[in-house]
Amino acid sequence: MSDLVMFEPGASTSTDVPTNTDQTAMSTTQVVDALECDTFEGLMNVNETYVEILDSALLSVQQHLDDNLKRQQQLKEEYRLYNRADITKRKVPVHLYMPPYFKDDNNMYPPMSSEAREKQVLKWFDPMMKEEKKWTPSEIKTLRTSVKNALVAHQVQPWCSRRDIVASKLRDADITTSNFDRRQWTMELEDLMRKIAYVREKSEEEVLTASADYTVVPWTAIANFDFKGSRTEWAVKSKWYNELNPKWNKEHWSNEEVEKLKYLRESPKFVSWPMLALNLGTNRTSYQCMEKYKTEVSQHSKEWSQDEDTKLIALTKITSINGHIQWDKVAQCMPGRTRQQVRTRFSHTLDASVKHGRWTDQEDVLLVCAVSRYGAKDWAKVAQAVQNRNDSQCRERWTNVLNRSAHVNERFTLVEDEQLLYAVKVFGKGNWAKCQMLLPKKTSRQLRRRYLQLIAAKLRLAAGFCNAVDAMKSGRRAPEEDELEQEDIVEAEQIPNELMKEVYEKFANENPDMNETPEEFYKRVSALERPAAARIRALKNKPDYQKIQDKINEIVQKHKNAAEIDKELHSSEILSSLTITEVDVRYMIERSKTLTRYYEARQFRKNVDQIGCRVRPIKIDLDPETMPTFDPNDAEDEKQMVIVESLCSVIRAHDVKEWGTKFWNEHRFTAPKYAKRFVENMVINKSKEVAEWYLHVNSKSCNQNDVHCPAKSTLPPTAASFDLHKMLQKARSGLNRLSAEHFYPLDVSLAQQFNFKNDEREGLDGDRRMHIGLSDEVTNSKEYANFYARMRSILLEPMRLGIARESSSDETKRLVRCLAEERACDEEQQVTCDQIRRRRMPDDEIYVTPTSISRELNNGMKIDTTELLANLDKNSAKKIRMKRKIGEVRCDTKIKLLPLVILATVATVAARPARPPRSSAGTPTPSHVSIDTESNISLKVELD
């Protein structure tokens, strides 16, 4: 081991010895660190040392990896908890920013000063007083349990003291104590334990009685320990004595109680509310009596004044917090009005954001979507989704119009009238939801309206205006078309079987080959007679038919049969069983006054009269029921006058009660019928013509004159068709992915189709078009032609609108582009007119303009670009010097005619600010410049 052993440890060394590595492995010489070891044992020791160092390094790395994994798990858990919806973000407590502002770590504020103590003695308002929170059911349960435990503890306190004494005697007994005493003490202790256990096991109803003494309850301990300081002693004690005490009556107020309360309060002998509660004799507190009288008894329905409306609007603005109005505070500031009254008045009348009047189709669509999302329960969220409508409007619209069941009928029979009056007797007036349980085919709104109609009918009968049958019929609306058709079907099914069989036998005798049953025969005959019945109903709706009907009624009145007499007697009995109170009469009178006031204060009355005065009278007698017609030869002013006068006449006629009733019963169904017929004609009949034209064009016998599609074969764009077009555009990407299983996109060539994989199919969006090739058997079929024609009729105009309408992003790009072009044009115009002075060149006094550059290019010019290229690329200077050594290349080109593109490019280059050349000792060597444009035109200018 006399030779020198070299060991290369890497970075850690003890002695630096320069050596040369193998020449075959390294191309250059390197100096490395080495260890000098004279013996093999020394080399092994060094090796073991490095092994230990490596092991410790591996352990350290492993420990760091474990720590990293643990930290990753912690971060994942924190991220999961952060994204959980049920864990709310921690917020700063609000009480930190509320008085008192000077608090220590325990939220304790300094003692009161002399001024504060004086204000407290004088009963001044305490600004530190907090508003009482509403009691929750859990807090009420805690209070009852605490009071019960306090009463039980006070009751068993003497027994517990005696128990402790007897127990101490038993513990202290010794040999001097007789067995008799021990036995007596043991029996007494067991008796005390039984009494204590019995009292402690009593229920709340047995302990919390009206005769219990609640003065022994430690209210301070309950407020501090049981409620942990969240309620004050005064709040806990007041809650128990004024509300939760069992001696107070908490049942619903009966009618006798309300009447007696009203009498005692309005009596001149009224002194105070405690005396009134004592005289009432129903175990009501003074606060209960005052609250009942202020909120319900004295709150009769009175008109809102202008001052009240102004005050209510101001209060809603003051008490509004983040869009939510505190109606309790508003009601407190409005004496004589309840919370529901002020809320209803503001939301239904005074709220400027709430829209009134007829519902549009767009609002109905929003309402249906909101109900499908939130359900027909949370009407506040539904109203927020619909916008400009309150919750009651949304509920009424959904319940009475959009979601009205097909079996709900507006008309009431005599049996249903009896059921309604019985339900009112059972449940009382106003409980229409409960009354609906007895009449499931009627809505609560229909029951209320029918009850008011019965009251009005009895008043008319008592006044002698009509008989009982006419009084019962008044107020009912005219039946709709679908209801009349349903009645025809029911009446047809109720035809006696004998008559049906007789007609069938006569018809079968004349036609022996008849294979129909009597039921099938009669159904076929009834189906043929239904259009005639509809025409007869339409005839009855005409005004001329009323005269004939009146004459027939006179004849029928003279010869009235017994059934009608019984019906009139039955109607009289129903009206006689109806009890009308003074409140009902007062309500009907106020309701009529309200309707009259609304009629006189209608919105368009003044405007219509003013417009009618400004319009020049025309010589045409207009009928509100007829549409205005024009003569093509009339002037445009005359046509405008006709339109304005017809609109004014329609509004005036609509204000008339008789014509308005006729409109709501008959004419309002005309427009939907016309629209339905128009759509059916366009989608079905016109589509057939388009389908025939499509098949004719695809056939071989098509001429050049047959290429044009039939005119007026598309529907006008509507909200429904436009929404359908939007829905199809949204679903286009999914449809493209479905069709990609069988077809390829148009931008995929035949050679690329082999490499078109599933990933590319899944990435298809709605902007790419598919190359869908259908067979001639499909495209030439009538079904495909009809489908094409109907889709064309519905979606052609919405597609044109979608193409013609510019998107917001495209509009922004276009405006930016136009502004840039205008700015560039203005700048070029100013430069041309020498309104903008370019930066002066360092070597001469010449100003560069597009005109001067064009003149120099036509005559030849000198441009030195050496320094310019050197500034743009540092390597270019080296290349230029290398080229100079080889030789200078010059190209003598005389430019006489330049294309317009080159001139524009040169003008753009000239418009840029010139760079000053670098200072050099000698004259720069001439070179060449290349100007590359977008059209790849290279321009080389000779430099003299």
UniProtKB/Swiss-Prot annotation:
Give start and end residues of each DNA-binding region. 273-297, 379-402, 432-455
Q: Which Pfam families match?
A: Myb_DNA-bind_6, Myb_DNA-binding
Gene inactivation effect:
RNAi-mediated knockdown from larval stage L1 results in decreased 21U-RNA expression and disrupted distribution of prde-1 foci within the nuclei of germ cells.
Which InterPro entries does the record associate with it?
Homeodomain-like_sf, Myb-like_DNA-bd, Myb_dom, SANT/Myb
- Residues in domain HTH myb-type? 245-301, 351-406, 407-459
User: What PANTHER family does the entry give?
Assistant: SNRNA-ACTIVATING PROTEIN COMPLEX SUBUNIT 4
Q: What is this protein called?
A: snRNA-activating protein complex subunit 4 homolog
